[in-house]
Swiss-Prot record:
Location of the protein in the cell: Secreted
GO cellular component terms listed in the entry, alphabetical order: extracellular region
Taxonomic placement: Eukaryota, Metazoa, Chordata, Craniata, Vertebrata
Record-given protein name: Neurokinin-A
InterPro entries reported in the protein's UniProt record: Tachy_Neuro_lke_CS
Predominant location category: secreted
Family of the protein in this entry: Belongs to the tachykinin family.
Amino acid sequence: HKLDSFIGLM
């Protein structure tokens, strides 16, 4: 998921 990837780079 896009949101999951966004959180992954946090």
